Amino acid sequence: MSFAVSLSLLGLVAIAAPMVASVLVALFPRPYAKWFSVLGAAVSTACTIALAANFAGAGMPDTQVPLISFGQTLVMGFTFDRMSTLLAPAFVGIGLFVVIYSIPYMSENNREHPDAPRRRFYAYLATFIGAMAGLVYSSTLLGQLVFFEITGACSWGLISYYMSPTAKKAGMKALIITHIGALGLYLGAAIVFAHTGTFAITAIAGLDAKLKAIVLLLVLFAAWAKSAQAPMYMWLPSAMEAPTPVSAYLHGASMVKVGVCVFARALVSAGEVPEIVGWVAIIDAMVTMLFGFLMYLPQKDMKRLLAFSTIAQLSYVFFGLGLSVFGSQLAFDGAVCHIFNHAFAKTLFFLIAGSFSFTLGTRMLPKLRGIVKKYPISGVGFGVAALAIAGVPPMNTFFSKFQIIAGGFSVGVGNVAILVLVCIMVAETVATFAWFLKWMGYCLPGEPSEEVAAGAPLPRAMAFVFIVLIIMVIVSGPLSASWIG
């Protein structure tokens, strides 16, 4: 079996296994639903890891594999490179741990949302996991669109899960805004096909400068919608109506990561990129960064604080991708690494918030005191996640933020405007550290508050997931940097 064929088979199974699991969830009685989801996600995770291992063992050669063509028109295909083989195991593996965490969370024992989990929860979540693998591996704009739309449908179903009026409104808001953004990807794909006769993302490189700029800006517009960047951010804070495991996956390794992945793939495939694309990307990133920071300052609900934090954190990625247009490969590498690193840190933080909802019946920060004494694992997880989001060494995001900032300073040597923007980013990261340090000092030490003291025991499945994610937050920074090279 050839190298390309073996990678393709592993990629296909990684996509198909969770989706087959979602069908089995619908066909079998409810008690089996969670186990089919765990099995599908586990098989998918194993395949993405095996694919990455084979890729590394062969010397990491960039590999394009056509899957479906009509005549000379490539419709669907796979791309295996350092970026896709790094991100796919993270997105799928985190999905597996979210499913495991959901088993105790989605139960009558949940103090905030007692619920007998319906099969659709596990069906949507399993489909989401498969779609993320498909999107990361896709080598065509049409393939990206297919999985782009599947993730949108899954997010609608999961955000609306509790079926309250606010949940249904939040789900519809996410669906509408991200579909408005999808128009950019549809138009970009149409332009590429009209001028090249193929949907391959690499065909963007063959367009003239004007058309290339238009296509990349359309892709950027679609990316803003999925990744909740200004002016398309408003769906994400509302999406906190979803069950917390869903919020963790949306923010850490699925919905919001779709946008940055699509834009990064377009940039790396486009050859020489017109500077207007870089300027639009970094200016919007800076506006979003400052807006997100200012908006999470007054938040007392832990999930809403983390939602606005996600908006700001993803602006770092767009800032790094924009800097790459001006010649900084270091900034591009840092942006890709930040997608990877942030996935573990933010998933951990959201799942910690969910554990408070489960055991205490609240996630309001002013009510959370003395966490370390009552829940040592949750307290350590809170601290590790907070330090990671703030970019404190040796946590993973320190390394990726450093790459982006260093790349920005290298570009800023010859461009005062960019240098100023990089300095603003540095100031924002320092302010973020100060704000999260405040909440760490308030919530973690001391005697437990009344709410914390009366809390229920932490389920073992949650503790297991926390331990794995804490380890990954610490080790994934050097891992991603060495993989991207």
Q: What does each model-identified segment do?
A:
Residues 1-10, 23-123, 198-206, 485:
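Transmembrane helix-loop-helix hairpins at membrane boundaries of multipass inner-membrane proteins
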Residues 12, 32-38, 142-146, 278-279:
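Short, aromatic-rich membrane-interface segments at the entry and exit
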Residues 11-30, 224, 228, 289:
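N-terminal signal-anchor/start-transfer transmembrane helix
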Residues 97-114, 119, 123-144, 154-445:
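Hydrophobic transmembrane alpha-helices and their helix-loop junctions in integral membrane proteins
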Residues 372-379, 429, 433-485:
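Cytoplasmic/organellar membrane-interface segments at the starts of transmembrane helices
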Residues 39-53, 181-187, 382-390, 468-479:
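Hydrophobic alpha-helical membrane-insertion segments
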Residues 30-42, 170-179, 375-381, 459-467:
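Alpha-helical transmembrane segments and their helix-start/interface "positive-inside/aromatic belt" motifs
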